[in-house]
Amino acid sequence: VTNSVDRRARASQKRRRLTAAAARVLHEQGIERTTLADIAREADVPVGNVYYYFKTKDELVRAALSEHRAHLDELTAGLDQLPTPRDRLKALVEAWIAQRDTAARHGCPTGTLAVELDKRADGTLDAEAGAVIRRLLDWTAAQFRTWGIPAPDDHALTLISAYQGMSLLTNALRDPAVMTREGTRLLNWLDSLEPGDGRDG
C-alpha cells in the first residue's frame, strides 16, 4: 500500500512539475513554437513522461491555463487579506508593475495565450483562456462594488483593459518603463476614486 501511495504522490508531483513547465514555456515561446520536448527539457523529465501525462499539445495548453488560474487564485487570495478594496486593487497594480521585465519579454501570460488561441478555428481553448480573464474581471468588479464605486463592472473593465494594453505595449516596445509609467497612472487613478464618484474619477 505504501509503495502504491508513494507512486501516486510521485506521479502527482511530476504532473504538477510538467504543468508549471508548460505554463512557463508556452508563455515564453507561444503555442506554435513550443514542442513537447521543450516542456520535457524545462521540467527536467524524459520526453516520454510528457506523452504519458499529456497526449496532445492542446492538453498541455489546457494544463497551462489551469496553472494560470491557480496562480490568479493564489494572488487574489493574498490580496483579499489586505484591509480595503482600494488597498487590494493598488496591490494588484503593484504586482503587475513588479512583473514589468517579464512583460517586456513575453507579455501577459493569459492574454498572450488568449490572442494566440483566438486565431484557431475550434474555439474551445480560447474560451478557457477567456474564462481566466473573466475570473480576474469578476474579482476586480467585486472590489469596486465593495468599495462603493458606482458602475463597478465598468471600472473593472477599465482597469483590466489598461493592464492588457500596457502589457501588450511593454512587450511590443520591449520597454519595462511602459508598465511602470502606466501602472503609476493607474495607482493615481485608484487614489482619486471615492465612493459615489463617476466613472472617470
Q: Which residues does each PLM region occupy?
A:
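N-terminal intrinsically disordered/low-complexity leader segments
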Residues: V1-Q13, G196-G201
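N-terminal positioning helix adjacent to the helix-turn-helix/winged-helix DNA-binding module
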Residues: R7, K14-R17, A21, H155
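Helix-turn-helix
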Residues: R17, A21-E59, A63
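Hydrophobic alpha-helical connector segments
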Residues: A63, E74-H106, A156-L159
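Short, basic, alpha-helical segments at the C-terminal edge of helix-turn-helix-like DNA-binding modules
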Residues: S66-L72
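Helix-loop "lid/cap" segments that line or gate small-molecule binding pockets
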Residues: G78-L79, A95-R100, P109-R120, T146
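Hydrophobic alpha-helical segments that form the core
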Residues: T110-V115, A151-A172, R185-W189
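Hydrophobic alpha-helical bundle segments that form small-molecule/ligand-binding pockets
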Residues: R120-D122, G130-A156, L190-D200
